[in-house]
Amino acid sequence: RYFDTIRHSVLLDKIAKRIQDPQVMGLVKQIIKAGGSIGVPQGGPFSPLAANIYFNELDWLFDAIRRKTAEGEYEAVNYHRFADDLVITVSGHHTKRGWAERALQRLQEQIAPLGVELNLEKTKMVNTLNGEAFGFLGFDLRRVRKRGGDGNFILMTPKKKARKAVQAKIRDIIARGGATPAAEVVNRINAALAG
């Protein structure tokens, strides 16, 4: 829904802060206004650029928060965004309690004037120290203890839905394999695994 909610007037104001040439702005207006007064078509070459322009100030805000909360090389609050998918991580140290709630509040304050709302089904706070996972860009991420028990690392695994889809493709490749040489079947399976 994010791409459908981008307000053209807000997007044009943000672009006009950087582009002074009236001819270029006229061309940009034609591109943006082609579909009405709200939304940009997903999948086109302009939509990723529009998404980044629309959230540029949000990116700068969370970069400032990241720098402000840094302790040496350790960052207490981190922000990662790809188009309309984003994740904010907060260190689990007991002195940082409440930071996640404040980060979520700041996020909501920043996106409300843009006409963007959080997807409440996908918005959640998790404690990775307790083994909880969170999803981002088709992957589940969870904190896992290193072998030998010395420290942790973040394990990324494809979401269950994606794994099932790949398994179904592999079953189909094998079922249709018939007299196909094994090397060719392996190549097809590898292509399915690579996506």
PLM feature spans:
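A conserved non-catalytic segment of reverse transcriptases
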Residues: 33, 114-188, 192
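A general alpha-helix detector
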Residues: 10-14, 85, 169-173, 192-195
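Alpha-helix C-capping/helix-to-loop hinge sites
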Residues: 89, 93, 173-177, 195
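Conserved polymerase palm-domain catalytic core
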Residues: 1-128, 133
